[in-house]
Amino acid sequence: VGAGGVEESLKKFFRAKAWALLHDPPHKMWVLYGTLKLTAGGHREDAVKVWEELGLREALGDPADSEEIVHAADDMASTSDRWITNFAFANVVRVFEYNKLHNIFDPKHQIDIRPLRRDELDEFLRDLAGELKPFAGDPRRVYHALYALYEVEWAARKLPPSLADTRAPTHTLFDHVYATALTLNLLWPDGKVGGYAVMVDIPGIQQVVGAARKAGDFWAGSWMISAVTWLTLWPFVWEFGADVLLKPSPRYNPYYHATLWAQLGGDHRLWSRFRELYSSLLPRPVGGMFEPQHAVRQPVIPGTACLVLPRVRPDGRELGRQQLEREVRERFEKACELLLALASGEQVSEEPYAAFFKLLSEKEGAQKPSARAVVKLFKIIKDAEPRAFEGLLRARVAVL
C-alpha cells in the first residue's frame, strides 16, 4: 500500500470508529421527545450536526461513507434489547418517554434524569471541539482524543446522561455507542463478521505477590503485574483505538487516560478534564491532586486481559491469526524487557512506550513508590520462586 493509500486507509478506519461513537447524538433522548434539537430533522440529522460542530468533517471526512458498516455494528451492539423491546412495544407508535436510569443488576436502584438544557449542550460541543482541534491533522490522534474525552467531558460537567433506549432504561447512550465502536472491530472492513478475540493471561500472579510480601514491598508485586499487562496492551490500543480493549475497559481508566495524555503531547488543559472527572470519583484530597504520574503508579490493571481486533489493520494490511499471536507474545516480552531497563536506570525512548516511561521517570519524592523496586522483586522471585519467574516471562495467549 502506497503512502497515499495508507493515509486514506487510516482516515477511513478512524472515520468509521468516530461515527460509531457519534451515530446517536449525546442528547438523543431529548431529540426523540422533541424538547432539544440542533436541526429540524430527527436524531440522525442531529448526529451529523454534532459531527460538524466538533470539526470532524474537516478532520475525518463525511460520516455518510461509514453509515452502512456503523449501522450493522449498531444493530449487533444492541440486538438483544431491540428484539425484546420491538416485540413488547410492537403496537406502540409514539415515543415512550421515561426519565430514570435503573441498575441492571438490581432495578430497584434508580436515579432520576433531569432535562438537558440547550446552553449546556452548546457549551459541551464548543469546548470538546476546541480540545479536538489540535489533533485534527492526524486521524489516529483525533480519534483517540474523541474516545477519551467524549464521555469524560460529559461526566465532568455532571450533565444528565441520555438513555440509549427509554424502553430498556438500564444503560446510557454512552454505554451503547462505546459498545458500537468495539463491535465495529468484528465487522471491519467489509461488514462481514470476523476479527479476533485475544486473551492474555500472566501466570504465577500469586507467587509474584507472595514474593513482594517477602521483600516487604506490597506495592511492587501488584504494580509489576499491572505495568506488564498494560505495556503488552498499549501498542494495540494505540494502533487500533482504545475500543479494542474489552478487559480492562478503557472507560474511566486512569492508565489509558494518563498514557494517552503523554502520547498526545502532555497538554495541561487536556489533563484538567481528566482531573475534574477523577476529583468527582475519588475522595478528597486525593482526587483534587490526581496527576498523570500518579495514575500510572497505581496497580489497577489485572493480569488477565482481552482484546477485540479486526482482521485488517488501520493502514489496510491483513492481520493473520498466527501473526497476531506472535505479535502479542513479542509485546509481552518487550514489556518485561523495558521494565527491567527502567528499573536498572536506563532511559526508555522506544515508541509507542516512551510516553508511559516518561511519566514513570518524573520525580515524585522519596515517599512515593519507585519503579526501581521491581529490580529487587525480580531477584527475589528468581531466587525463591524460579518456576514463577519462568512463568512470569511466558504469558498465556489465546487468539480466537
Task: Name each model feature, range by range.
Residues 1-400:
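Regulatory and interdomain segments flanking nucleotide-handling catalytic cores
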